[in-house]
Amino acid sequence: GKIVGGSSAENAQIFLRGMPEDYDSWAQAGSDGWSHQDLLPFFCMNETDLDYGDKAYHGDAGPIRARRFKHAELNTEHRAFYAAARDAGYADCPDHNAPDTTGVGPLPLNNAEGIRWSTAIGYLNPARSRPNLTIQANTHVCRVLFDGKKATGLQVEQNGTPGGCAHLSATGPPCPAVQSPGRRLRLSC
């Protein structure tokens, strides 16, 4: 999404990870460090799961707060859908972000306490006053510039005009949280 916080600031506020086998297929295709086990620590660092933060596959101290509706909070239509799915043989799935789960149940949402916990709120707001961070409106990253394997800069387009360049002095991925692998592949070519 073209908003501060990217796609995490849009749509239905669903905070759902990909299937472990999808990440594992990336690693098997040669993307070292992208297996589910490799990424799990980052998933955990990213979240404060208000329902399952005590589980080994969830976090309890990350910047993005996640929750699920309790069954008693579901509206009539949701309860009917849940009952129909269970009657059709689908397993109860209280945590869709748990490894190897399928079934029907409430989705994890990033809207705890009535706030949409986007990457802008969870990551950028606490860092806005840092001298090494610049947030620019109407700016799109077109390419990540490398010196060997180290990202050193960004080629950007501002207000639809290409050609700007920004120097990277901090470590870490200069990509949004959503669509990152695909974006990294496109930007690093």
Regions found by a protein language model. Name each.
Residues 1-44, 155, 189:
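N-terminal glycine-rich phosphate/pyrophosphate-binding loop and immediately adjacent elements
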Residues 7, 13, 52-55, 146, ...:
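Short, solvent-exposed loop/turn and secondary-structure capping segments
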Residues 42, 144, 154-189:
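Glycine-rich loop(s) and the adjacent beta-strand/alpha-helix scaffold that form part
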Residues 11, 15, 65-67, 94, ...:
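Structural recognition of the beta-strand scaffold that forms the well-ordered cores
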Residues 27-151, 157:
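Conserved redox-cofactor binding core of oxidoreductases
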Residues 9, 92, 162-163:
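Short, isolated positions in well-ordered beta-strands
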Residues 5, 20-21, 59-62, 183:
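Surface-exposed beta-strand-to-loop junctions
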